[in-house]
Curated annotation (Swiss-Prot):
EC nos: 5.2.1.8
Protein name: Trigger factor
Domains: entry comment: Consists of 3 domains; the N-terminus binds the ribosome, the middle domain has PPIase activity, while the C-terminus has intrinsic chaperone activity on its own.
Compositional bias ranges of the Acidic residues kind: 432-455
Gene name per UniProt: tig
Lineage: Bacteria, Bacillati, Actinomycetota, Actinomycetes, Micrococcales
Molecular function GO labels: peptidyl-prolyl cis-trans isomerase activity; protein folding chaperone; ribosome binding
Chain's role: Involved in protein export. Acts as a chaperone by maintaining the newly synthesized protein in an open conformation. Functions as a peptidyl-prolyl cis-trans isomerase.
GO biological process: 'de novo' cotranslational protein folding; cell division; chaperone-mediated protein folding; protein transport; protein unfolding
Length: 464
């Protein structure tokens, strides 16, 4: 068998394949056996019909077609291995030449177009320079953390006054379009200033007391009329404020392992300082990755983006009722998917150059961490990803994280005040990031990996 690669674009190739008759013949012989088991000829047992009679009954052309269809994927896979290309999508195959049915020789020729991982040239990434915010925690950070802790133990009390920022309301809302009611809800709980409901809600309810209402214009975000302009009437049924427990030694004993408020504040200060270091590390990591993408040109196949785009909405990430399936959202998903693809290609190339490996313990640690983020039992989570064939994807993700950590370890990082930043607490000795913040591929989006198509999934099918 001969194969040759024709580069169509940086991310798409045409694989021209020639299969000589001697390599085609085993598939033809197998096709005769298959056809023989499917037809009945008087005087012959099923499966024992001679080839000449099969040619007379169904035609040698049908046998050749069966042989080609059965063997095509194997020849394509062999050509992929021989050429060294790394497919990203299913191939589009066109048969360009078949043996003459009236002859006993002649080869097969076909062309397969497929998207492939682009080849890139890595820059000198040692010593990349980035600047991050200074990691300074203050008494204000401690006060904020203490107030948040007090809030967990707070109680709600009805008040007879206008609603203010931070208050908790019980509300009824009714939406109308052109004077016709299109949606309504009663007894909703809402915190003023949360910004989690409708645009304009906070402004409308601020200053309202119980049994008062207001009307405001907004854009609906859910239901059959998502994205449409509407008038919304909001009626306040109750106004409540949260009473926080007094910050004293008794509260420290109630809310923590400490006996005194001073000990609790000291621990909160330590947590705030550690949090600032992690934030600094995450910022450095993201900026290093941004710099890598700036330095390397990575072409993105349209098919990869569109495939992930459709998967995103098909799997319900558009929230089921189409409320978020807007062109603006689609453009956001396209951009995120393209960026995730670029990140993957760059980090995979760095991992290959740095000969980054993933140990079993590193994979287990990552699975346990990911399981906790989903609130799942690690063993159950591991079983699910194993059954769904996602273990290789997990290995790739850990490998990329380690590759980025290698670059991060070589980067020159300073804060906004010109001080050198020590990231040793952020990067593990083995080269893996300590912080479990966002995935380095930033594929929020789900979007899945834009990696090579497994051999069993890239079956070649000829065009009709």
């Amino acid at each position: 068998m001969k194969s040759a690669v024709e580069n169509l674009t940086p991310t798409r190739v045409k694989l021209n394949v020639e299969v000589p008759f001697e390599e085609l013949k085993p598939s033809i012989d197998s096709a005769y056996k298959t056809v023989a088991s499917q037809i009945q000829v008087p005087g012959f047992r099923k499966g024992k019909v001679p080839a000449k009679l099969i040619d007379q009954r169904v035609g040698r052309g049908y046998v050749l077609e069966t042989a080609i269809n059965d063997g095509l994927n194997g020849w394509y896979q062999a050509a992929v291995q021989e050429s060294g290309i790394r497919p990203l999508s299913r191939p589009e195959v066109e048969i360009t030449e078949v043996p003459d049915p009236s002859a006993t020789d002649g080869g097969l020729k076909f062309a397969a177009e497929v998207d492939v991982r682009p080849e890139i040239e890595l820059p000198d990434y040692a010593g990349i320079k980035v600047e991050v915010a200074a990691a300074e925690s203050s008494d204000a950070d401690v006060d904020k953390a203490l107030d948040e802790l007090r809030g967990r133990f707070g109680t709600l009390k009805s008040v007879d006054r206008p609603a203010a920022d931070g208050d908790f309301l019980t509300i009824d809302i009714t939406a109308t379009i052109d004077g016709e009611e299109v949606d309504s809800a009663a007894g909703l709980s809402y915190q003023v200033g949360a910004g989690t409901m409708l645009e304009g809600m906070d402004e409308a309810v601020t200053g309202l007391s119980a049994d008062e209402d207001a009307i405001f214009d907004t854009t609906l975000v859910g239901g059959d009329h998502a994205g449409e302009a509407a008038q919304v009437k909001v009626a306040v049924k109750a106004v409540k404020e949260r009473e926080l427990p007094e910050a004293n030694d008794d509260f420290a004993q109630l809310a923590s392992e400490f006996d005194t408020l001073a000990e609790l504040r000291e621990d909160l200060a330590k947590q705030a300082a550690e949090s600032k270091v992690v934030e600094q590390g995450v910022e450095a990591r993201d900026k290093v990755l941004d710099k890598l993408v700036e330095l390397v040109e990575v072409p993105v196949p349209d098919s990869v983006v569109e495939e992930q785009l459709e998967a995103h909405f098909k799997e319900g990430n558009g929230h089921g009722d189409g409320e978020h399936d807007t062109e603006e959202h689609r453009e956001e998903v396209r951009a995120n998917t393209a960026r995730a693809f670029q990140n993957e290609i760059i980090l995979d190339a760095i991992a290959e150059k740095e000969e980054v490996d993933v140990s079993q313990n590193e994979l287990i640690d990552y699975i346990v961490t990911t399981a906790s983020q989903y609130g799942m039992d690690p063993n159950q989570f591991a079983q699910i990803i194993d059954q769904s064939g996602q273990v290789p994807m997990m290995v790739s993700e850990v490998r990329r994280r380690k590759a980025l950590a290698v670059v991060l370890g070589q980067a020159t990082v300073t804060d906004s005040e010109g001080n050198a930043v020590d990231l040793s607490d952020f990067v593990r000795p083995g080269g893996e990031e300590e912080a479990p913040a966002a995935e380095v591929t930033e594929a929020d989006t789900a979007e899945g990996e834009a990696t090579e198509v497994p051999a069993e999934d890239e079956k070649a099918e000829a065009k009709a």
